[in-house]
């Protein structure tokens, strides 16, 4: 079944063509009514200046939005099939068209939801797009943190929605396994290894100006920007356990211990001990280890990837330096010998260095090379999720994409804003380098995955998220996930109770589509029932709209509205199913079966489960 908005748009377009206004290629906006007492949908076409101007070329009086709306409604009401789709079409204000759907159409949509089951909400596109969606892409220099967890939940949900809307999606993780951060990781691991053998370390302190200085006294200087977390001690022991030959010789360890006793040592201990190659090796091994833990944690978090693309592979295949030639005339060499990309031609605030004066490529050039592989793989659209600290990076990469011939409208970067952790109303401070942070692994061991994913997608990308641990641990309906989950579990409880009372066959509990074969009676379309019918009918377009706008939080809002409508449905005694005659009970259970399908499918698209049973169930 096509989304209702599509059917309404087609009907409105035909009505416009029937009044002699044809050949206008403009979109028709169909919105939900702000106040449902006026209708289900609102069409603002008569208020659109472009539409009025185009229509007035044939009918000059259509410059008046009210007259344009009156003509559309009159044509709509006289069209074949109007009565099957619309219960009413009325004009409000200067030219808004309010549309109300027929009860029979809403009932048909609900029966379709029950019939399709887990497939309801999915649609097909006439021209599906192939999309590469890159997300998480966290540096493999430590465990995944809670910020990466949000990116994972958002990205996975977006991909699910795009696939449900009919597109083909390739999910990719870009592995930053090359460069300065990997070097720092290797050096940090090596110093922790020497510490485990008895050498002392000392750590730099940052002052109020942001400058680092080491405290007086003995110790091997630890890199100020290195990874301070004590989790590295365990990682080093794991690496040594699998590769005992990596342990430095006894004389080197002795020298390291002696060096660490000196108070006047300000040099690089790794260079002094001639252990640079070992540090490089440890950096590679540590990144491999952390990447393996990333994959495991993401799998546990129900996040799927189709590919992991290594930055190191780009450097080893010489694709990075070759990428500067992809930018054509948009590169130049300055007086210091650096090669720059003219990113100011594309809205950046300054031109960017892509090759340093010593011939080494910058991270930007590596990123350009990686994105060129996406172009070569012929994806129709390229989507990325980045963290809030990368906002200023968008213009330069978007400019590079244009310079390489990729359409700007098909490249999009979504910024996942910061996660603020709250415990007992107080903020929890995080830092991967200092080791003071909550890992994804710890999070999903303490908070159920369903709750965690719900919290991470319930706000838009651009909204900061307050993750309240106290609320996340709460299993009552104050927790928004459980509010929605209870709604599904309650329906399933009602189905089981109806079978126990003999109102429906036991087989229909697990296969609600069997209800469609049973005798049912017409039921009064009360306000509470109608709202449920309408919300069930909306799921396909809610999914499609959320996919098109890349806004998974819209599905969260929809599910919460559906659960709220269900709660109101239970209030009148006339909706108490176990007190009904069998044929009336079947009709109400078909409605609830449609609601359950929407709750389950909506949660599923966001990577969450809809429980069959919960401790608190009501009939």
Name these PLM-found stretches.
Residues 2-107, 115-118, 122-619:
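Non-catalytic interaction-recognition regions
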